[in-house]
Amino acid sequence: MSQLQARFFTENKKYLVDDVPFSIPASSEVADLSGVINKLLEAKNAGHKHVEFDFLVRGQFLRTSLDKHIETENISTEEVVEIEYVEKFTAPQPEECIMHDDWISSVEADSEWILTGSYDKTARIWSMEGKAVMTVAGHADVVKDVAWVKRDGLNSVLLTASLDQTVMLWEWNSERNKVKARHCCRGHAGSVDTIAVDPTRTKFCSGSWDKMLKIWSAVPTEEEDEIEEPNRPRKKQKTEQMGLTRTPLMTLSGHNEAVSSVLWMDADELCSASWDHTIRLWDAETGGQKSTLSGSKVFNCISYSPLCRRLASGSTDRHVRLWDPRSKDGSLVLLSLTSHNGWVTAVRWAPSHEHQLVSGSLDNVVKLWDTRSCKAPLYDLAAHEDKVLCADWTENGLILSGGADNKLYTYRYAACVSDAGA
């Protein structure tokens, strides 16, 4: 097979070529096809400037020659081969390196502020330029996770979860730059490793080393909940903790080992991952289990994309796996992304791109994936000098990662803002 018939198509109207079959060499690779498209565009518009393109055949990126790809994917050449082309994704550009005093366990950012949690028992708020704005101190042990509850003008509400078995709810006024502990959420009997705020921003869920999930109110009030602790003098309790005591609205039990990651799929449905090799879906209204996805190894992290309705998981066997959480077959993995050489400790879907996600690992590397190219990542972000422990991805195209080198790196990734529909 020396030549084959191909038709090129794209969703980007700026780069449309004639919708007719072309005869092209079967041995063509990405650079050859990119040259063909650019020549066709030049013929239509003399002022066309060269653009690097990527190509998809049957929804998979071309990473070899066309004939090899067609053979591997078992595609017939009897008919015209349909080839989609998209503008090549440029590499994320490094922006800031923000030094911390200890390991960075967690990060959550928006368009204005970055919130990090650290093994030095504090959380910190940073500007996008890497300026330290506020240190949030009050825990007696390592901060394991952080989350923004809401950002309302000058007043923000945030959460910190800790190895000290508590979650603290804070109010921060950015104009006065004052932070106040409003509530100390108590009820877990082990390290609180993961927290997630619901879509209404009125509740949050926590997951713990004690195998339990708990749902709490995320609304600051002036009320203190009573807590049953017969062996603890009340006076001592008052002086030890910051903020009013808050107890959970509901406890969800079912996991047999530590809960490592939790998220809300919508206002009524929770998803949790555990060291017991399962991912479980829960009814957040009743607290009942809805379904279980079973794996063969410990799950460290999960992320859900409402755009593609897929769940991504990271495990101790170095694989990132994609699941359909609605599937009746609870062990069906849709796709495995295999490139890391250590435990996968962080996964995060792109907020504005249904095919892209990042993963971080104990191998010190952050990888940017496109699910249409599952055999290799789009890019390796290899700035860290030690274990990667957390990652985030903001609506405005910032990728962040933190780790055991005490550094938070930020990268600007324009492709997922401008090319959200690719």
Swiss-Prot record:
Q: Which GO terms describe its biological process?
A: maturation of 5.8S rRNA from tricistronic rRNA transcript (SSU-rRNA, 5.8S rRNA, LSU-rRNA); maturation of LSU-rRNA from tricistronic rRNA transcript (SSU-rRNA, 5.8S rRNA, LSU-rRNA); regulation of cell cycle
Give the start-end ranges of region Ubiquitin-like (UBL) domain: 4-87
Quaternary state and partners of this protein?
A: Component of the PeBoW complex, composed of bop1, pes1 and wdr12. The complex is held together by bop1, which interacts with pes1 via its N-terminal domain and with wdr12 via a high-affinity interaction between the seven-bladed beta-propeller domains of the 2 proteins. The PeBoW complex associates with the 66S pre-ribosome. Interacts (via UBL domain) with mdn1 (via VWFA/MIDAS domain).
- GO MF, any single term: ribonucleoprotein complex binding
Entry's localization field: Nucleus, Nucleolus; Nucleus, Nucleoplasm
Can you list the GO cellular component terms from the UniProt entry? Answer: nucleolus; nucleoplasm; PeBoW complex; preribosome, large subunit precursor
What this chain does, per the entry, is described as:
Component of the PeBoW complex, which is required for maturation of 28S and 5.8S ribosomal RNAs and formation of the 60S ribosome.
The gene designation is wdr12
Please give the chief subcellular localization of this protein. nucleus
Protein's name in the database: Ribosome biogenesis protein wdr12
- WD repeats located where? 99-136, 138-180, 187-226, 254-292, 294-333, 339-379, 383-421
Instruction: Report the InterPro entries cross-referenced here.
Output: G-protein_beta_WD-40_rep (IPR020472), NLE (IPR012972), WD40/YVTN_repeat-like_dom_sf (IPR015943), WD40_repeat_CS (IPR019775), WD40_repeat_dom_sf (IPR036322), WD40_rpt (IPR001680), WDR12/Ytm1 (IPR028599)
Among PROSITE patterns, the record links this protein to: WD_REPEATS_1, WD_REPEATS_2, WD_REPEATS_REGION
Name the SMART domains on file: WD40
Task: Please list where the region (Disordered) is annotated.
Answer: 220-243
Alphabetical UniProt keywords: Nucleus, Repeat, Ribosome biogenesis, rRNA processing, WD repeat
Top-level taxonomic group: Eukaryota
- The signal peptide here is none
Q: Does the keyword Repeat apply?
A: yes
